[in-house]
Swiss-Prot record:
Belongs to the GTP cyclohydrolase I family. It is an enzyme of class 3 (hydrolase). Pathway: Cofactor biosynthesis; 7,8-dihydroneopterin triphosphate biosynthesis; 7,8-dihydroneopterin triphosphate from GTP: step 1/1. The lineage of its organism: Bacteria, Bacillati, Bacillota, Clostridia, Eubacteriales. GO terms for cellular component: cytoplasm. Keywords: GTP-binding, Hydrolase, Metal-binding, Nucleotide-binding, One-carbon metabolism, Zinc. InterPro entries: GTP-CH-I_C/QueF (IPR043133), GTP-CH-I_N (IPR043134), GTP_CycHdrlase_I (IPR001474), GTP_CycHdrlase_I_CS (IPR018234), GTP_CycHdrlase_I_dom (IPR020602). One of its GO terms (biological process) is tetrahydrofolate biosynthetic process. PROSITE patterns: GTP_CYCLOHYDROL_1_1. It comes from Clostridium botulinum (strain Kyoto / Type A2). It comes from the Bacteria. This is GTP cyclohydrolase 1.
Amino acid sequence: MAIDVKAIEEHIRGILIALGDDPEREGLKNTPKRVAKMYEEVFKGMCYSNDEIAEMFNVTFEDDLCINDNENDMVFMKEIEIFSHCEHHLALMYNMKVAIAYIPKKKIIGLSKIARIADMVGRRLQLQERIGSDIAEILQKITGSEDVAVIIEGEHGCMTTRGIKKPGTKTITTTLRGRFNTDPIVSNKLMMLYTK
């Protein structure tokens, strides 16, 4: 799916008029075009399904070091910074830090690909819970491992700048698949690494 930049421009112009402003005044003349260009960038992930993102970043390596040596060995990354926009208010979700873990099953994925997946999934109209679920699904497809965990901490503009207006409020979500959800040893190890 391609993003319709021209339609966005027209609608932003209409929003400016609906707000009671003049889209032809000096400060706003190019605003519809700038907003459309920004949306094309920040919503790039909407152009791709989870399957397409999995295909895009499907660069793996054989993992002959930990095949059945220790079934609790995991790959863990944290502090991956992303942003997103909530689908309810189009408000920015910011200061988002993602932690991702998986237990390799003969294949490992390049570390930069993990961060790229998180970034691409965030570039959609989203819910924080769905970001975690989408990342987990994509990693499962690429690595062949059922054992994937995603922990996300973030702030939501819809909580901090409107409505209840509680700046500094953080939302933490977890997506635990496979043994991260069923094996206390694995989940305890994950939490130890996350809080370290």
